[in-house]
Every structure is written in structure tokens, then in C-alpha cells.
Amino acid sequence: MAANLVQKYGLVPQTLYPDAFNAQNSATMRRLITTKLREDALRLRDLAKSSSAEKLATEKEQMLQEIHLILTVMLGPPPSPSKEFNWEYYDKDKKFHQVTITPKDFAAQLSDPKAVKVSDGTDVHSLFSLVNDPRNPYYRLLTVDHLGNVVDGRPVTYVNVPMPIIKDACISMIKRGIPVFFGSDIGNYSDSKSGIMDTKLYDYELGFNVQLGMTKAERLMTGESQMTHAMVLTAVHIEDGKPVRWRVENSWSEDAGTKGYFVMSDGWMDEFVYQTVVDPSFVSKEVTDVLKQEPIVLPLWDPMGKSLY
């Protein structure tokens, strides 16, 4: 989804468009937008009973302008994709550079497959998502209804595979020095202060003398678990050929975990990791061929799309 935004609107250096306060403290902004959207949805439903399609379209446009106003006030006006900016910087060799360019052209230069390589032989444009959703058949392509943020953008799809396939791809990428984006349910059996993610972190069964035995599929079906947060895998500890624990880079500042890094047990990965973004060269043809399928469309409220809304 971020790739669609970059392709349409471009990029600017962070120094020229730094984060506003609300970008790092977004709870109030998200709550306000959600409240406004719910109010607008009720109004549109009421208007649909007696108004024409043209009237509804006009009302919807006005509502979207108000949402845009809220975002602009709280985050600042976004850079125009076609307006040139000036950027001065020093490269790693202390050589001075000056650039005058539009955000779209800047993004196009950075998006050149010859220029953007996170590792030798890895094209960031070819990366795709693997998911582990045991509710649905493996080796099938999945998507979520209305999951997309840009008209005519690249569709958001997932290749559903067993966890061993995901782990093997992640290990191979890490060994090549490539960090791995992943989506998980961070709220279960994790502690942000210590930076530990482990299914054995809390022994609720011992403490309360109860049994907690839902499977991963059952947790998804009941809403007990869903993708809520994205992080990055940067290292893995392997014993006797099997992963034992993973190093995770989080985005909650250096105050969380060990200077922003967490340790995730392999058991936690089995139960609460749902998505990874991988290079096709690290999976089999059987997996990449799934991308040619017509996707199974999951409903709008499905947990597999939760972290992307």
C-alpha cells in the first residue's frame, strides 16, 4: 500500500517534511477521523433512501474534504507531487550535493530497479506477501475486500502458506543480510519494557487454574487475535538447523526493549506472526505460481486486513 502512495505522490527527504507531533502521537487523530467517518456513513445511509446518486456523490466529496482538512491541520499540508523542492546534502564520502526535483521524479529515481537494491540481486519491486492463515487453504491467493488506498494501484494480495515456508524464506533473507518486514499480533504474550515476545512469558493456566487451548485458526475466527502491528526481522538464532529465537526491530523508540530491539521466541512466531514480505528468489516456484491465481476475497472486516486500515 505504501508503494501505491509513493508511485502516485512521490517522495521528499524527511528533513524537508519532518514528522508533526500528531504523526508520532496519532491516537487522537485516528479517533477523531473514525468518529467523523462513522457520522458521515450514517448520513450517507440516510440520504440514500431519498436522494439521487449525484446528490450522494456531492455529499461524499464534501465529507472527504473535511477529512482532508482534519489531516492537514494535524499533520501539515502534504508536499505537491509536481512542485520542485531543493535539497542539499553530503554523501558518505563528504561530497556536497544539491538537488532540485519534484517528489514524483525523486521517487522515480529512487524506484529504478538498478538503483534500489537492498542486497545484491534483490529487487524491492518484486517483493510480495506470504501469510499464514490456517482458516483458509494453503497455496491459495488471498485478498481483503476494499483493501487498497489508491485508485488503480497495485492490488494487495497474500500467498497463504504453512509457517515452515515463511520461516525458511525469512532465514534465507536474513542470511543474505536482508531485513524482513512482518505483521503480527503484538498484544499477546509480549512485554515492551523488556522487549520479550514469548508464549511462555505469562503462565495464565498456572495462575488461574484454567485451560487456554484455542488454535491459531480459532483465535482468528473469534477475533481473539489479528494482525495489529508491523516490525522487522533482523537476525535469527539457529540450533541444530532449527530457529530458536528471532531479533526484532520495533518502532517504539529506543526506550522499548533493548534500544528498540525485541527478542521473539520461535513459538511466538508460530502463534502470532501472520504476514511476511519476501523476495521471490527465496521461495519455490510452487509458491510464486500462486500469484497467478484469482484471489479468494475475504470480507472487509477480516482480521487479515486489520493492520492495513
Residue map of PLM features:
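Extracytoplasmic mature domains of secreted/periplasmic and thylakoid-lumen proteins
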Residues: M1-D40
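Residues that flank catalytic or metal-binding motifs in active/ligand-binding sites
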Residues: A2, I178, M227-H229, V244, ...
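Structural recognition of the beta-strand scaffold that forms the well-ordered cores
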Residues: N4, P13-T15, V180-G183, V232, ...
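Solvent-exposed loop/turn segments at secondary-structure junctions
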Residues: P13, N22, G187-Y189, S253-E254
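Short coil/turn segments at secondary-structure boundaries
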Residues: Y17-F21, K83-E88, G183-D185
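Aromatic-residue-lined binding/catalytic grooves and analogous aromatic/hydrophobic interfacial grooves
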Residues: R38-L147
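Long, positively charged binding patches that form subdomain-scale interaction surfaces
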Residues: G153-T228
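Conserved catalytic-core surface of thiol
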Residues: T234, E239, V244-Y309
